[in-house]
């Protein structure tokens, strides 16, 4: 015969499960926004964003962006990643499943399928911007001097791309029933689960995502700058005039001398070149009579 203590330890058959049973081996609902979860998220943001600073110093010096351009580029990406992060936190608490596992599944889908969708979205928007000639909406270009309106417009476009990406990932999550996949069931410590979901795995994946997406957002500006530089060089070559000067030789033949019109060659050098070329005599052909030289 068991006493009240035994019944309390097992929990009543018709009542709610005990606190130990509900919390053992799984994150509780809302655990992602508790104090420990918020601390891990802040630490992750600082560490992951520092990879963008490392990327800037790894760029060649002649292609390295000024700090203001770098900040405008990376701030768009930071805002987009914050949107994805809080969307994942919200979606993780919608069901009764383990929120840590759901967050991790959402995050991994964002890092795989989502990366492809972001690339397609950036390319599609770039084509539309070039077609409509919206110069202020070209990713990575903010005018000279810098215009805040250009940054706001590009940031809005990038957020639209992120909304599209998150919507597709959410549909994939629902169709394939990935919410039933329990990736973290073998781990029994909820705090360790939270650290894996919020810090350890996102650190490596976010570093890669920040690095790749930064190339998406800055590529158009670098390409356009190279095209403008190439066009300027082409114009400078086409703009230089070329003239011909004729000099009579002793044999009353004419030799053509090509002289560039960039005024870098002095007149004395031109005359010296003419004197050097005029003494050249043409080779006289020998006359033949009946096949024998005369």
From Swiss-Prot:
User: Which GO-annotated molecular functions does the record name?
Assistant: calcium channel regulator activity
Keywords associated with the record:
Endoplasmic reticulum, Membrane, Transmembrane, Transmembrane helix
Subcellular location, record wording: Endoplasmic reticulum membrane
Provide the tissue specificity: Widely expressed.
Sequence similarity: Belongs to the STIMATE family.
**InterPro entries given in the database record:** STIMATE/YPL162C
Segment Disordered: which positions?
Answer: 1-22, 227-268
BP-aspect Gene Ontology terms = activation of store-operated calcium channel activity; store-operated calcium entry
- Chief site of localization: endoplasmic reticulum
Q: Which organism is it from?
A: Homo sapiens (Human)
Which top-rank group of organisms is this from? Eukaryota
Of the GO CC terms on this record, one is:
endoplasmic reticulum membrane
Domain-related comment: The GXXXG motif may mediate oligomerization. The C-terminus is necessary for its localization at ER-plasma membrane (ER-PM) junctions as well as for the store-dependent rearrangement of ER-PM junctions.
What is the protein name for this chain? Store-operated calcium entry regulator STIMATE
Q: Where is this motif: GXXXG motif?
A: 149-153
Report which gene this protein is encoded by. STIMATE
Region Required for localization in the endoplasmic reticulum, annotated ranges: 241-246
Transmembrane annotation, as ranges: 29-49, 69-89, 102-122, 156-176, 194-214
| Stretches of the chain found on the membrane's Cytoplasmic side | 1-28, 215-294
State whether it acts alone or in a complex, and with which partners, per the record: Homooligomer. Interacts with STIM1.
The protein's matches in PANTHER family, at most eight in alphabetical order, are given as: STORE-OPERATED CALCIUM ENTRY REGULATOR STIMATE, VACUOLAR MEMBRANE PROTEIN YPL162C
Instruction: Note the topology in the membrane.
Output: Multi-pass membrane protein
**The protein's role, per its UniProt record:** Acts as a regulator of store-operated Ca(2+) entry (SOCE) at junctional sites that connect the endoplasmic reticulum (ER) and plasma membrane (PM), called ER-plasma membrane (ER-PM) junction or cortical ER. SOCE is a Ca(2+) influx following depletion of intracellular Ca(2+) stores. Acts by interacting with STIM1, promoting STIM1 conformational switch. Involved in STIM1 relocalization to ER-PM junctions. Contributes to the maintenance and reorganization of store-dependent ER-PM junctions.
């Amino acid at each position: 015969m068991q006493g009240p203590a035994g019944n309390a330890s097992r929990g009543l058959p018709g009542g709610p499960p005990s606190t130990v049973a509900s919390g053992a081996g799984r994150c509780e609902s809302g655990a992602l926004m508790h104090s420990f979860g918020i601390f891990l998220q802040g630490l992750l943001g600082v560490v992951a964003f520092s990879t963008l600073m490392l990327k800037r110093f790894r760029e060649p010096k002649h292609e390295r962006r000024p700090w203001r351009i770098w900040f405008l580029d990376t701030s768009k990406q930071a805002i987009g990643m914050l949107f994805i992060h809080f969307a994942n936190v919200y979606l993780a608490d919608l069901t009764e499943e383990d929120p840590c596992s759901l967050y991790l599944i959402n995050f991994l889908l964002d890092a795989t399928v989502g990366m492809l969708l972001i690339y397609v979205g950036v390319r599609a928007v770039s084509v539309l911007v070039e077609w409509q000639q919206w110069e202020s909406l070209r990713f990575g270009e903010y005018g000279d001097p810098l215009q805040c309106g250009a940054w706001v417009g590009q940031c809005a476009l990038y957020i639209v791309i992120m909304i599209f990406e998150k919507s597709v990932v959410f549909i994939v999550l629902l169709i394939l029933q990935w919410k039933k996949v329990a990736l973290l069931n073998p781990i029994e410590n909820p705090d360790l689960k939270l650290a894996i979901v919020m810090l350890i795995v996102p650190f490596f994946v976010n570093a890669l995502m920040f690095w790749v997406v930064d190339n998406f957002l800055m590529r158009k500006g670098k390409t356009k700058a190279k095209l403008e530089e190439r066009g300027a060089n082409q114009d400078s070559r086409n703009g230089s005039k070329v003239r011909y000067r004729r000099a009579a030789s002793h044999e009353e033949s004419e030799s053509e001398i090509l002289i560039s019109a960039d005024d870098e060659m002095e007149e004395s050098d031109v005359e010296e070149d003419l004197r050097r070329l005029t003494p050249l005599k043409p080779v006289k052909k020998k006359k033949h009579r009946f096949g024998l030289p005369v």
